[in-house]
Amino acid sequence: IADKAFYGKGNIKRIQILNSNFVHIGNNAFSQMGELERLDIHVADPQQLSLGDNIFGSSGYFNIYVPQGSVGAYQIAEGWSQYAEYFRELEF
């Protein structure tokens, strides 16, 4: 996802990253998204994703859904651990 890809898109409530081969979230990609409620990431290993700076900015609180069994890995992964309380398991 490019830098500032969804920056300021206040009307978007849910984003799904369905490709398990996804590798990067750019700087401020999801910043200033006041209505965002849910981000689904279908990537089991957080180490597979490189993160830009300030990816969520001041978007407020929302849930980040990751594959079953991956919540713990995301909660302690570098770059993701600051959002530990946001993570939930995806249900299929």
Named regions from a protein language model:
Residues K9-H24, G34-S50, G60-S70, E85-F92:
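Structural signature of tandem-repeat unit edges
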Residues G52-I55, G72-A84:
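Short, aromatic/basic amphipathic alpha-helical patches
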